[in-house]
């Protein structure tokens, strides 16, 4: 059975593990335990053909910056995650995560994933962010970032409610099986 390797990266506590556990077990985990490295496998049908979707969870904490890339070889698609309630994690997609995966795996398709969308309209979250002169990130901001970085696309979900969750992995599978062709600048011949 063919395998698709999907690696999930992003800051600590943005919901990477919850995303994977909720998708693979249909249950939302109740406790937060920082991940060092974990993997999960599910069988998915694509047309009439079964595939193994290998899901690799990684640690977002800086302590693991040297260890994390060991999970990158042979990756078919990356999910680069941020929480829509954490502007710092959104900035780190551009400053840290996208450059890191492109350094180690140039040309591998990446999706930008906004997590915890169930908290976007939560009054206590909005108040906490407002005290810091911030607000939850919008879908449009995610799409703009994906375009700016050259990601395959922007998707968002809630591991708690499962809204958009299956779509994240459906889009990852599509990107892995049919990676976009990188746009090469057309070279022009100039005769002077």
Swiss-Prot record:
Modified residues (Cysteine methyl ester): 189
Ranges spanned by the short sequence motif Effector region, renumbered to the chain: 32-40
Key word Cytoplasm present: no
Propeptide: 190-192
A Gene Ontology molecular function term of the record: GTP binding
Principal subcellular localisation of the protein: membrane
Compartments in which it is found: Cell membrane
Keyword line: Cell cycle, Cell division, Cell membrane, GTP-binding, Lipoprotein, Membrane, Methylation, Nucleotide-binding, Prenylation
Chain positions recorded as GTP binding sites: 10-17, 57-61, 115-118
Bilayer disposition of the protein: Lipid-anchor
Gene Ontology CC annotations of this record: Cdc42 GTPase complex; cell cortex; cell cortex of cell tip; cell cortex of growing cell tip; cell division site; cell tip; cleavage furrow; cortical dynamic polarity patch
Single Gene Ontology BP annotation: regulation of exocytosis
Lipidation, S-geranylgeranyl cysteine type: 189
Keyword Zinc: no
SMART domains in the cross-refs: RAB, RAS, RHO
PROSITE patterns according to UniProt: RHO (PS51420)
Subunit and partners: Scd1, scd2, cdc42, and ras1, in its GTP-bound state, act cooperatively to form a protein complex. Interacts with gef1 and scd1.
General function of this protein: Involved in development of cell polarity during the cell division cycle.
Record-stated family: Belongs to the small GTPase superfamily. Rho family. CDC42 subfamily.
NCBIfam families found in the cross-reference section: small_GTP
Protein name as it appears in the record: Cell division control protein 42 homolog
């Amino acid at each position: 059975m063919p395998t698709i390797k999907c690696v999930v990266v992003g800051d600590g506590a943005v919901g990477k593990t919850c995303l994977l556990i909720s998708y693979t077990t249909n249950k939302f985990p109740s406790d937060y335990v920082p991940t060092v490295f974990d993997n999960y496998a599910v069988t998915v049908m694509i047309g009439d053909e079964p595939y193994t979707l290998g899901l690799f969870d990684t640690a977002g904490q800086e302590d693991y910056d040297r260890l994390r890339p060991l999970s990158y070889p042979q990756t078919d698609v990356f999910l680069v995650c941020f929480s829509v309630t954490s502007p710092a994690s959104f900035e780190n997609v551009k400053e840290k995560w996208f450059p890191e995966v492109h350094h180690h795996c140039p040309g591998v398709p990446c999706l930008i994933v906004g997590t915890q969308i169930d908290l976007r309209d939560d009054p206590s979250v909005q108040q906490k962010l407002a005290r810091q002169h911030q607000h939850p990130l919008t879908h449009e901001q995610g799409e703009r970032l994906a375009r700016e970085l050259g990601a395959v696309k922007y998707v968002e979900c809630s591991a708690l409610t499962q809204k958009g969750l299956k779509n994240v992995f459906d889009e990852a599978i599509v990107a892995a099986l049919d990676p976009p062709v990188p746009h090469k600048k057309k070279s022009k011949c100039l005769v002077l």
